[in-house]
Each structure stands twice: as structure tokens, then as C-alpha cells.
Amino acid sequence: MITLYEAAIKTLITHRKQILKHPDSREILLALGLYWDKTHILVKCRECGKMSLTGKHSTKCININCLLILAIKKKNKRMVDTLIRMGADVTYIHLLKNKIKLSYNQLSMLKSNSQISLKELHAICYLLYGRLPKKIKQGMQLCKTMAGLCGELL
């Protein structure tokens, strides 16, 4: 069974071209730790377990720990949080000689917190609701469900 969060991410990836056309979408995705590079949304490949930038398995799937190291080097704390929640190995942190102001214990605690906050859920809901054409009924249904969970009407 797939979680509501996974369904939302799948919808975001499926319709990423439409969603990324809007200028504020990138900022929201960056704040959620889901935006990487200029045109990609991060997702874990179901076939190989690596990170995929397209949502499909290919030779371009990237090891999640490599992305974690890149995120730490760029001091992108939100991306670090997201990658750790997605299963990145926090033991790779020692390679970076404390270039980020997070201790090993703080990073370990982030891994155990796999719940998505209502604020994050609302931001994803806003993206899906505001960016997808009305003819996409599944996206709209998902948005209504998410809006109900957030306790807010869009």
C-alpha cells in the first residue's frame, strides 16, 4: 500500500513539467527538500533503490549517499533532512569534516523522524491543486484529500 505522501510525490513527478512552469513552484519544492538541479524532483527508484531524477528506472539513477554528500557540501540542510528521511546513511557525514553545523546525533535524530509535517503536506497540496489542469481528476482528488488532512480549504 502506498502512503499519501508517496502518492503526492508520484503526482508531482508525473506532472513536473506543468508544475515547474510556475515561478514559485521551484521555491516551494526547494523548501520541501524535493527540488534538485533545475528541472528535477527527487524520488527513490522502486527497482534499484537509488535516487531517480525522472521517477523511472534508468542508468541515471544516483546513489542516495552521493546526493547526501553533495547536499552537505552545498550546505543545503533541507535536502540533507529529506535524503536522510529517504534512507541515506548518516555515517557518510564524517567524510566531510564538519563542513555543516549539524552533529552526527542531530542527523541521526532526523532519520527517525519520518513523519511529514502538516506544513509540508499543505505546500505539496498547494502545488498540486494550483498547477494541474482541472481535467486531471486523480490529482484533484488527491488535493482534496490532502486539504482535508491539513484542515484547510484551498
UniProtKB/Swiss-Prot annotation:
Belongs to the asfivirus MGF 300 family. It comes from African swine fever virus (strain Badajoz 1971 Vero-adapted). Plays a role in virus cell tropism, and may be required for efficient virus replication in macrophages. It comes from the Viruses. This is Protein MGF 300-2R.
